[in-house]
């Protein structure tokens, strides 16, 4: 299987690529270098951008109508080169703009270096683009590395480079970066949120679409994790991780392989690594904030929250270091490699192989029925459940919710949205007790041998107890509202 994958490098690191021992050891002959220039154009009214397109005119070669973002329903995975809507064979051919003239929005100028790499897995053709993006109002450096060849060879090359340089799939295409620079608006990510499986026909198709989408979302969110950044980056990274792990487990009855199991274990470790940062964010933004507001002038509370902020800083040190380390880049590349290689096909034969071709809707119904039955059994005697039982019920609800998000696009949208809203309310009601339990543990971890600190911890614990009491009935009400009639996957 031959593939072409696009990666991004910081320009400074791109300048060191040729000196990398791996490249020097495997390069075929000398690298060739040539000037590179590309211009992106649109009408003054932005008619092409409104369709998610730009006209791309390279210095050499044919002009193309470049797609800025993949269509929402299209299959996608990280490092996938941006799509081409049309190729113009002659200079006078133009995209349809209702007669409006085209104007240049932004341009790339730099160098294109090409070289081959001879690996045991095969020969890889590499193309390094390094230079500057320019618009009327701004400019910035940019670099891209395109690797083409047999899949095992391309992934081996990407892995070897990423072990020593910050190579990763690009967060945006050069064309989208050019559009953002010209418009002054931020670049738009390839993918966010839950996956769109609406066009999936088979079980394997749905699996590939969901995993590819969620790998992209995870990459996008993790890239935003930084000191002083929005707490949503860590939160959404953990959500993407949980959604991705849910997909691996939900489809495991049909799509299974040791490489997928290994990937799941590595993703679980990342969830744990980001946990402390998220816990301290929730504590400081929730109960800690409410206590600080209620005791605005109390030095003991202020000291406790300063200690909490110091713990959060340490947790973010670990999170930022993790996503900047080679291990994180290699995890993304290994996950992409498994997705593209599809090793479960070789392991499947007979009925398992046929199961890969099962209609996605039929498989979705069976999977959701199993999760629904488990949730209803766990909550059958809701009023008598212990705290531990409610915690397990919350986890069952979360598993059902993530599975429902994957299959919802295959069914009636209105019914699916209602079901997910009601399930989310149940999760919120059950989650309060969990958040409070975590907050109580964090507060106790801040305890010190002083009367002031002990008093402040006691205030936080008391606040936690009061919050649980105030919301005790929310989960019960949400449970009664979530009835069997809400199951969007039943019927036609």
PLM-predicted stretches and their roles:
Residues 1-492:
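Function-determining surface determinants
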């Amino acid at each position: 299987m031959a593939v072409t994958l696009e990666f991004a490098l910081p320009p400074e690191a791109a300048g060191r690529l040729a000196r990398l021992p791996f490249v020097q050891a495997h390069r075929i002959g000398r690298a060739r270098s040539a000037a590179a220039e590309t211009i992106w154009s649109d009408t003054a009214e932005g008619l092409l951008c409104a369709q998610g397109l730009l006209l791309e005119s390279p210095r050499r070669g044919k002009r193309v109508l470049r797609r800025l973002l993949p269509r929402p329903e299209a299959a996608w995975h990280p490092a996938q080169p941006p799509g081409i809507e049309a190729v113009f064979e002659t200079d006078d051919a133009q995209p349809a703009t209702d007669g409006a003239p085209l104007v240049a929005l932004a341009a790339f100028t730099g160098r294109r270096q090409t070289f081959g790499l001879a690996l045991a897995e095969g020969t890889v053709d590499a193309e390094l683009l390094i230079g500057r993006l320019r618009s009327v109002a701004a400019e910035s450096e940019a670099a891209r590395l395109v690797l083409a060849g047999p899949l095992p060879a391309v992934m081996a090359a990407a892995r070897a480079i990423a072990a020593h340089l910050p190579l990763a799939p690009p967060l945006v295409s050069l064309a989208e970066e050019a559009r953002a620079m010209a418009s002054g608006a931020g670049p738009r990510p390839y993918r966010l949120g839950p996956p769109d499986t609406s066009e999936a026909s088979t079980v394997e198709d749905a699996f590939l679409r969901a995993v590819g989408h969620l790998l992209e979302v995870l990459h996008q969110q993790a890239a935003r994790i930084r000191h002083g950044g929005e707490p949503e980056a860590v939160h959404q990274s953990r959500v993407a991780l949980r959604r991705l792990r849910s997909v691996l487990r939900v489809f495991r009855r049909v799509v299974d392989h040791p490489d997928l199991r290994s990937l799941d274990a590595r993703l679980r470790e990342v969830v744990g690594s980001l946990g402390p940062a998220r816990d301290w964010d929730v504590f400081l933004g929730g109960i800690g904030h409410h206590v600080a507001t209620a005791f605005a002038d109390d030095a003991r509370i202020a000291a406790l929250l300063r200690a909490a902020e110091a713990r959060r800083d340490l947790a973010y040190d670990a999170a930022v270091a993790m996503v900047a380390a080679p291990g994180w880049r290699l995890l993304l590349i290994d996950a992409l490699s498994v997705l593209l290689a599809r090793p479960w096909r070789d392991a499947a034969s007979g009925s398992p192989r046929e199961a890969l071709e099962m209609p996605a809707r039929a498989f979705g119904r069976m999977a959701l029925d199993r999760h629904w039955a488990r949730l209803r059994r766990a909550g059958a005697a809701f009023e008598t459940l212990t705290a531990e039982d409610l915690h397990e019920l919350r986890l069952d609800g979360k598993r059902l919710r993530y599975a429902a998000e994957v299959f919802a696009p295959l069914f009636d949208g209105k019914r699916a949205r209602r079901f997910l809203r009601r399930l989310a309310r149940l999760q919120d009601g059950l989650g309060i007790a969990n958040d409070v339990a975590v907050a109580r543990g964090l507060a106790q971890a801040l305890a010190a041998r002083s009367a002031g600190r002990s008093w402040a911890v006691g205030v936080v614990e008391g606040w936690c107890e009061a919050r649980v009491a105030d919301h005790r009935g929310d989960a019960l009400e949400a449970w009664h509202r979530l009835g069997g009639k809400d199951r969007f996957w039943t019927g036609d």
